[in-house]
Every structure is written in C-alpha cells, then in structure tokens.
Amino acid sequence: MSVDLNHTIVHARDNRESAEFFVDLLGLEITSEWGPFIAVALNNGVTLDFATIPADRITPQHYAFLVSEEEFDAAYAKIGQRGIEHYADPHRKQPGAINYNDGGRGVYFMDPAGHAMELITVPYGGWTA
C-alpha cells in the first residue's frame, strides 16, 4: 500500500504572515488561496495550508523540514539577517547555534504563530545505504 501525506493545516494568528514567512525563508511559493486557507507547496507536492484562527486556540506544533546544504545556508543566512532567535537543540539550551547531528546540520526556531520549526540536512538516523 502506498500512503502519502497530501496536506496539513497549520494554524496561524495571520495566515498571510505565516505563509509569507515560509515562502521567504525557504524559497517556496504560495500555490493557491481558497476559503480560509493559503497553501504553500513543498517539493514533494505536500502543501502547508495556513489558516487564521484566534491566537488563544493555537496549539504549538513541531514541523521539521529536510533541506539541501544550499537551502540550509540560504535559510540560515536569512535567520541571522532577521535576528530570528534560533537554537541548536529543541529545548533551547544552545542559543545562536546549529547542531551537527547524524553528520548534517540542523537548527530550531519559532514561526510567527509560535510553532517550533526545525531545518535538517540529514534525516534522523542518517541516510540509509
């Protein structure tokens, strides 16, 4: 059986602000807007469908994105240019740093809605042979 993720709804205080944050930071594009949703497409066809909801109803989630070394460099440069607080670890004990887990690089930061974001260049456990 083949099962693929098609889309996920990402709650935001402002769907446009959150969608544009991802578009700008990761070089993605808005592919559609309908109803309460602004969809941002990832390379594998999955969309992040941003929906505005009241801030007190947002439950922070964690989203991890596997990116190339070049994409990491570009995104990390933007994180630095914008003064976005970032950490090498999910518990925020190593501020202003990145990690080198599994032979790659990774960084954690928050999006405008308070979701914990992670960029990694190597999947957890490393690449399979």
Predicted regions and their residues:
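Short, flexible helix/strand-to-coil boundary loops that buttress conserved ligand/catalytic motifs
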Residues: F22, Y76, T121
